[in-house]
């Protein structure tokens, strides 16, 4: 394969198994059993351990995992007192990472092809990459969730993000985390546990700055099920915005072009409060709303998808929440700097 790393073809660590599967979770009773079932066959074929790292679930998730572990000796449950996903993966590597070449991170809220783990291991071996990331396709069940999936699969919702639109494998600086070699994971200090959101992008920045390489594969992908209500979607993207701001502030990097436009949304919406003084204050927010709803209508016509119009509204929720979260974190940082 063209463009492979100089790690390609190197022997494995002595006595180390290829990979361990790490599933961070919190209150995922509705999904955890199917996710474990999905990866169990691969775990058997590749001799992998499955670690469910639970952040204190109260909905029966732990009991489900415990019952499944009785008949599945590869399955283990770890307690994650810090609750967040970044801490969950770090804990898994701390406890068992020394016995494995790499970790495969699985989202409890997602779905995966039956050969997902095999393809990741093959790609890591073929390219010599230090991390393999995948494309993410979003699907939904209810009306709002389906509309959100349509939005997230479009440029309106993902801004043309590389790991949303993959036709050919290539080297990249970021993607949806799938496989990471344990050695480089430890070398850069693992995930920053001060990040409750966007820990993957922050990690990828440190990984690539340290000279490690990330391969975006087209050989497999994962399916993600978005939040099913306006409130939960807004809360999620508020966290994403704050995480992105923290990443930029920590590393003093300039936001990418596709991130600059959503940054204007919260100020534009806030500016509508000046409409009593001048009606022109409505124009920026009005143009943004018209663009989103119009794009949703275009999706409905072009793709013959009845969820298109509502997808425009879902995109508005995501844009506004992300922008508000970003500015909230930025202003909080300025206040902390002023006090210091």
Regions of interest found by a model, annotated:
Residues 79-98, 119:
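Glycine-rich, basic loop-to-helix element that forms the pyrophosphate-binding segment
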Residues 100-111:
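Short beta-strand-to-loop acidic/aromatic patch adjacent to the donor-nucleotide binding site
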């Amino acid at each position: 394969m063209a463009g492979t790393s100089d790690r390609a073809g190197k022997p494995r660590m002595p006595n180390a198994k290829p990979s361990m599967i790490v599933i961070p979770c919190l209150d995922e009773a509705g999904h955890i059993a199917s996710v474990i079932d999905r990866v169990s066959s691969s775990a058997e074929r590749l001799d992998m351990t499955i670690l469910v790292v639970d952040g204190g679930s109260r909905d029966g998730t732990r009991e489900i995992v415990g019952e499944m572990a009785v008949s599945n000796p590869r399955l283990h449950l770890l307690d994650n007192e810090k609750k967040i996903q970044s801490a969950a993966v770090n804990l898994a590597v701390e406890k068992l990472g020394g016995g494995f070449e790499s970790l495969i991170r699985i989202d409890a809220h997602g779905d995966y092809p039956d050969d997902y783990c095999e393809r990741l291991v093959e790609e890591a071996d073929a390219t010599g990459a230090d991390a393999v990331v995948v494309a993410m396709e979003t699907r939904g069940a209810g009306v709002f969730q389906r509309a959100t999936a349509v939005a997230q699969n479009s440029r309106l919702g993902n801004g043309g993000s590389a790991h949303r639109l993959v036709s050919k494998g290539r080297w990249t600086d970021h993607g949806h985390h799938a496989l990471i070699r344990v050695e480089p994971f430890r070398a850069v200090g693992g995930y920053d546990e001060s990040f409750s959101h966007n820990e993957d992008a922050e990690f990828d920045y440190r990984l690539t700055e340290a000279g490690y390489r990330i391969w975006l594969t087209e050989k497999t992908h994962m399916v993600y099920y978005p939040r099913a209500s306006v409130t939960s979607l807004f809360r999620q993207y508020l966290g994403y915005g704050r995480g992105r701001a923290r990443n930029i502030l920590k590393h003093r990097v300039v936001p990418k072009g596709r991130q600059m436009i959503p940054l204007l949304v919260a100020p534009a919406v806030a500016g509508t409060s000046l409409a009593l003084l001048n009606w022109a204050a409505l124009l920026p927010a009005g143009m943004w709303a018209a663009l989103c709803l119009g794009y949703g209508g275009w999706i409905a016509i072009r793709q013959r998808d009845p969820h298109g119009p509502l997808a425009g509204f879902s995109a508005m929720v995501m844009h506004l929440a992300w922008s508000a979260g970003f500015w909230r974190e930025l202003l909080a940082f300025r206040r902390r700097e002023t006090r210091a």
